[in-house]
Amino acid sequence: MTLIKDMKVDQYFDGFYLIKSVELRQTRAGKDYLAMIFQDHSGTISGNLWDAQKSNIDNFQAGKVVHAEGKRELYNNMPQVNQIKLRLAMPLEPSDPSEYREKSPVKEQNLRDYIQSIVFKIENANWNRIVRHLLRKYDKEFYQFPAAKTNHHAFEGGLAYHETTMLKLAEKIVEVYPELNASLMFAGIILHDMAKVLEFTGFEDTAYTLKGNLIGHIVLIDEEVSKTVIELGLDENSEDILLLRHVLLSHHGKLDYGSPVRPQIKEAEMIHLIDMMDANMMMMSTALNTVQTGQQTARIWPLDNRNFYKASWEK
């Protein structure tokens, strides 16, 4: 079985893979085909099943495990598989979808333990109570959901993994800049993307919910915090509550990026920069994992449509 990360350009492969997503499309000639994304625990790759028949459309659905044969190619410098032959995995074959999903490289319990250790460092009582309340409310989802649909940390457990990496960066930054309020940084980071559990449907065949499309996670987390403030009987007009809401509402940094306000305190600016840093690192790493040493990646649209080069010291 060929892992997706081990597929080489112009080489044939075969193996079992999960259909992460599938979309029925038509060619210019009006013929049906399936635009698919295949996945195993090492990564994802796209491919098209041409001249799709009704049986193909009925059988090859998201969440199904298939045996695939084909050729790994480049199209517009993007890796894809072509000349695909597919069949559904049989009962005695490795057909459990959970075996193929890309997951956080850190085990869930380790993520839980680390995040809980950071919660103990949130010294402001109001922020601490809000964080604990929402972590309890979305306990299961917070550690299972991805942080994004496609761009970064788009895998099972990606949300908590993203938060953990950001918290580790924040711990170092508050050492270098001791004037920063560490408690606000930690609370803001844990909460900033938590409403992704409301914005997305889950880690399998991830799609936007109606709330996600119409409202978005930035406004949704502000609503969650505001409701929590009322439930806990806190003063919604106190400075600490307003500052917590501010770092959450401003964490995308710019109005063009979806934040209704721009950062107006140091902690808000730092959370935005840490968020961007971790997301960008993940996008670069994901793209570089698809190419060999000495090659360049396909263009990464969220990173100003740039290519990145895989240097000799990278695995």
What is each residue range found by the language model?
Residues 151-152, 161, 172-293:
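Divalent metal-dependent catalytic cores for phosphoryl transfer on phosphate-bearing substrates
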